[in-house]
Amino acid sequence: MGEEAPEEYELGGGEDERVMEWETGLPGADELTPLSQPLVPAGLAAAFRIPPEPGRTLLDVHRASAATVSRLRRASSSSSSSFPAFASKGAGTGADEAESGGGADGGNGNTNNSSSKRARLVWTPQLHKRFVEVVAHLGMKNAVPKTIMQLMNVEGLTRENVASHLQKYRLYVKRMQGLSNEGPSPSDHIFASTPVPHASLHDQVPSPYHPHPHHHSYNNAAYAATVSSYHHYHHANH
């Protein structure tokens, strides 16, 4: 059996295909057991009736190495592309923001890994405008993260994203009403990009009670009639 591979045979493209960090700590060529030497001595193999292994050549080793390198490269490339970039539905989201989750995922990757990695979401003016419209529709008091997320219907948007933004938005509305100095500044480019609807401002601060004028007149007339009846009864019995 030959010990050398044909000169024209190359391991997946030669030196360019070598991954040097995978070779760190491996024994050198002079430290390896020669291919011609069996791992089990002949006497021991005969005693235990172990059939001899077929001989291996350098060509066999190169083929096995090429197959291993190919499998490792495929596994590495598939794992790096399994978490795709975030794409929003018509609302223009960006790449990152602090909660994440789930976020920045884009179209054709393996969704099984999306729960273990949460990219961060950027609130753009378009996405914030959609958020404001949904909050105005629900009413500030009734707006909760889960319902907002469902009505916005934006791919990659998580409940945590919405909860954080809703908290900031409520502080922003209070600041616009002059009730607080906390929250985003009125000049914040995201929050200022969409004016706060009048209904949201009105909903945040309960209006004082004002009795209806007709109701007020009715009460006065009823009181006057009661007093008149009392005086008439009092004079009739004296």
UniProtKB/Swiss-Prot annotation:
Keywords: Biological rhythms, DNA-binding, Nucleus, Transcription, Transcription regulation. Residues 100-109 have a biased composition (Gly residues). Residues 71-119 are annotated as: Disordered. Disulfide bonds: none annotated. GO terms for biological process: rhythmic process. One of its GO terms (molecular function) is DNA binding. It is found in: Nucleus. The keyword DNA-binding applies. Residues 71-90 have a biased composition (Low complexity). Residues 115-174 bind DNA. Induction: Circadian oscillation with peaks at subjective dusk. Its main location: nucleus. PANTHER family: HOMEODOMAIN-LIKE SUPERFAMILY PROTEIN-RELATED, TRANSCRIPTION FACTOR BOA-RELATED. This is Transcription factor PCL1.
